[in-house]
Amino acid sequence: MSEKVFKGVEIVGTSDQSFSQAIEVAVKRARQTLRELSWFVVEEMRGGLQSGGLEYQVTLRVFFKLDSQDKADSEGTLV
C-alpha cells in the first residue's frame, strides 16, 4: 500500500460576483503555485461592504500531496 502525506495551507479568495466565484478564484490561483492539489475545505465565508457593492470573501484550506521521501532525500530538501 502506498503511504501519502498531505499538507494544508490557508488561502483567501475574493469576488464581486459570488462565494462560488471566490472559491474558483482561490483554487485557480493555488493551482498555479502548488503541485498535486487534492481537496479543499471552506473554513469561513464573509462579505466585505464596498462603496456601491459587495465583496465575497472565502477562506479555504487547500491540501496537496508532499513529494515522496525518496525524492526529497535525493534532492536534500522536502518539497
Model-predicted segments: where are they?
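Short, well-ordered alpha-helical segments
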Residues: 2-40
